[in-house]
Amino acid sequence: MSDKLRQIAFYGKGGIGKSTTSQNTLAALTEMGQKILIVGCDPKADSTRLILHSKAQDTVLSLAAEAGSVEDLEIEDVMKVGYRDIRCVESGGPEPGVGCAGRGVITSINFLEENGAYDGVDYVSYDVLGDVVCGGFAMPIRENKAQEIYIVMSGEMMAMYAANNISKGILKYANSGGVRLGGLVCNERQTDKELELAEALAGKLGTKLIHFVPRDNIVQHAELRRMTVLEYAPESKQAEEYRQLAQKIHANGGNGTIPTPITMDELEEMLMEFGIMSAVDESVIGKSAAELAAAV
């Protein structure tokens, strides 16, 4: 494993556009001459679909189940090579409601390390579900694999709530390992004062807003063709946005911070400061519209 290897991770709540953002950013990094390995750590197994032009890659866990055990697999069975020679692996997870989805993450990373998948690459990128930072999904952080965490969020309250929760997970392991918060990436949802809120949250968490990715329908057009914007429309404004994000991440090595998570009350206070949320009158909690009208 190379001394200069950068191990980064993209975390974010489900549906925030984390996998799309990460794949486009990593594609942009290859234009800068960087060699990339993607390790998908999301049970949806969609962390590599735009790179491989596929619906979903076969996962380490599903292939291991077919073969008998992970020891019966070869690295070629689980690692596929896609756009601009990006190496792709999906860890996978168990059937819904059965077992720990994080188990696939642990199994995959151990298998990849033991079989030389990290050799000759400049970046390993973990794409991780981040609604809950449970033990399994926190594995890239806990085991000191991912050194730089980039949280994909938006100006929506639950996306900011998830970003704060992920920061708590990073803080828990920051002192025992070397993991740091690299910064926030705001994937625009066109909510009120979104840029200002993202910058304010970054300040509260003791980090910075790495990049504000504007909303553009070209992303959806590319996704329908299972392609990154970099491949589908390389001359587009959106492709340039991802190039800028890639350049900022590339220049950010060693600049991560130990996050300073906030409370739910502080998050709500921040929303009130920006006029997104009004102070709540406790006397109206739990009252229906009809009850409130009758009380007038």
Curated annotation (Swiss-Prot):
A molecular function (GO) term: ATP binding
Quaternary assembly: Homodimer.
Similarity section: Belongs to the NifH/BchL/ChlL family.
Stored InterPro entries: NifH/chlL_CS, NifH/frxC, Nitrogenase_Fe_NifH, P-loop_NTPase
Segments forming a coiled coil: none
Name of encoding gene: nifH
Binding annotation for ATP: G12, K13, G14, G15, I16, G17, K18, S19
Native source organism of the sequence: Acidithiobacillus ferrooxidans (strain ATCC 23270 / DSM 14882 / CIP 104768 / NCIMB 8455)
The organism's place on the tree of life at top rank: Bacteria
Listed CDD domains: NifH
Role of this protein: The key enzymatic reactions in nitrogen fixation are catalyzed by the nitrogenase complex, which has 2 components: the iron protein and the molybdenum-iron protein.
HAMAP family: NifH
Organism ancestry: Bacteria, Pseudomonadati, Pseudomonadota, Acidithiobacillia, Acidithiobacillales
Binding site for [4Fe-4S] cluster: C100, C134
Enzymatic reactions: N2 + 8 reduced [2Fe-2S]-[ferredoxin] + 16 ATP + 16 H2O = H2 + 8 oxidized [2Fe-2S]-[ferredoxin] + 2 NH4(+) + 16 ADP + 16 phosphate + 6 H(+)
UniProt protein name: Nitrogenase iron protein
Cofactors, names only: [4Fe-4S] cluster
UniProt keywords, alphabetically: 4Fe-4S, ADP-ribosylation, ATP-binding, Iron, Iron-sulfur, Metal-binding, Nitrogen fixation, Nucleotide-binding, Oxidoreductase
Residue positions where ADP-ribosylarginine is found in the record: R103
Any one GO BP annotation for this protein: nitrogen fixation
Cofactor binding: number and manner: Binds 1 [4Fe-4S] cluster per dimer.
